[in-house]
Regions:
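Substrate-binding cleft/loops of secretory-pathway carbohydrate-active enzymes
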Residues: 198-221, 321-325
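Hydrophobic faces of well-ordered beta-strands that scaffold small-molecule active sites
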Residues: 34-38, 59-63, 98-102, 147, ...
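Short, acidic/polar
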Residues: 41-55, 129-138, 204-215, 296-302
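Aromatic-rich peripheral "rim/lid" segments of glycoside hydrolase catalytic domains that contact
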Residues: 24-26, 111, 120, 137, ...
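Bacterial Sec-dependent signal peptides at the C-terminal "C-region" and cleavage site
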Residues: 9-22
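Boundary/entry segment of secreted carbohydrate-active catalytic domains
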Residues: 19-60, 64
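Substrate-binding cleft and catalytic face of glycoside hydrolase catalytic domains
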Residues: 21-24, 56, 60-74, 83-200, ...
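Acidic-and-aromatic substrate-binding clefts and catalytic sites of carbohydrate-active enzymes
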Residues: 37-48, 69-82, 156-161, 199-207, ...
Length: 357
């Protein structure tokens, strides 16, 4: 029996090693990069194992938080670039495509940005000046180093209208256009993107398409649309993902899946029964592991079917342990488990990529 246990353990180690010898980036079609959002411990090198995985598996990185408005400009008269500098340098040192996320968003932006000197809401001219200063300072600092920027994030509401964010209220509907204008002025060579979620929903997708067409009509640079791709096992249906991709690409822009993960937990109210809210606290059942693998295989087949349109796929986190979707529960949305071992979902993605070659 002991020999069987030792043999099984040895087989498991060999299998894991074989998996880790497979690099996703080596299997991607020409013109399509594969990336991951990384956190500060990772790009600063404190998590050595993570650094090895990131640089082995991926050829693109996005920052979880360090390039957002609040971390880079915590006060009107103060910028803070230490962490952002290290993130960018990590990508350059490892010859990876570096993406900047994000410049203008209604969240993670200091309240001071939207306040006037009298404590009332800032007027249009004040807000435009602050936006221009921020974008020119941040984008200008990394000119020639950051490949592309999520210029505006989540500006469209679920009904397809422009979200009534502090930016929209203070500046007007043209705040998005102004952000793209300022970003291009700061780095003429950087790619510029619009990024949002739920683009499989027709009304929201129509609003995004209308927005980017307005930017195009103004002759402003916009290179791509980022579909965040925070999905679930059964939703959105694969046909809806396919249809959304086709319609977004019909704008003439690149399509990118920028924050990919697959949420396995139910939406439950605060205080819900733990057995309902956190059903996989003791591990993920094999049946659900296989469902996750099939889901990842299906979505990657769509990406590969439209390889003429899709230029990037980025996972939002390296492993289940790193995912923002845990939130005090046990979620399993990515390709590697909490011990950073490849899951059946990893094998499914590898197979889909190999079959498409």
């Amino acid at each position: 029996m002991m020999r069987l246990i030792i043999a099984a353990a040895g087989f498991a180690l060999l299998t894991a090693a074989a998996h880790q010898d497979v690099a996703l980036k080596a299997l991607m079609p020409k013109g399509m990069v594969i990336g991951v959002a990384i956190n500060q411990r990772q790009f600063e090198g404190a998590d050595v194992a993570a650094v090895d995985m990131i640089t082995t598996q991926f050829n693109q990185i996005s920052p979880e938080n360090v390039l957002k408005f609040q971390p880079t400009q915590p006060a009107a008269d103060r910028y803070a670039f230490d962490a952002a500098d290290r993130y960018v340098q990590f990508g350059l040192d490892h010859h990876m495509q570096v993406v900047g996320h994000n410049l203008v968003w209604h969240s993670q932006t200091g309240a001071w940005v939207f306040q006037g000197a009298d404590g009332k809401p800032a007027d249009r001219d004040t807000l435009l000046a602050r936006m221009r200063d921020h974008i020119r300072t941040v984008v200008g600092r990394y000119k020639g180093k950051i490949h592309g920027w999520d210029v505006v994030n989540e500006a469209i509401d679920e009904d397809g209208s422009l979200r009534k964010s502090p930016w929209q209220v203070g500046i007007g509907d043209d705040y998005v256009a102004k952000a793209f204008e300022f970003a291009h002025e700061a780095d003429l060579d950087a790619e510029l993107y619009y990024n949002d979620f739920n683009l499989e929903k027709p009304a929201k997708r129509a609003g995004v398409i209308k927005l980017v067409q307005d930017l195009q009509a103004r002759k402003l640079r916009i290179d791509g649309i980022g579909n965040q791709a925070h999905w679930r096992l059964d939703t959105p249906p694969i046909d809806d993902i396919d249809k959304a991709l086709v319609e977004l690409h019909a704008t003439g822009l690149k399509v990118m899946f920028t924050e990919l993960d697959i949420n396995l937990l139910p939406n439950t109210p605060r205080g819900a029964d733990p057995s309902v809210a956190n059903p996989y606290a003791n591990g993920l059942p094999d049946e659900v592991q296989q469902q996750l693998a099939r889901r990842y295989a299906d979505v990657f087949r769509v990406f590969l079917k439209h390889r003429d349109a899709v230029t990037r796929v980025t996972f939002w986190g390296l492993s289940d342990a790193d995912s923002w979707l845990n939130r005090g529960r046990m979620n399993y949305p990515l390709l590697w488990d909490r011990e950073r071992r490849p899951k059946p979902a990893f094998d499914a993605v590898v197979e889909a990529l190999r079959n498409a070659r």
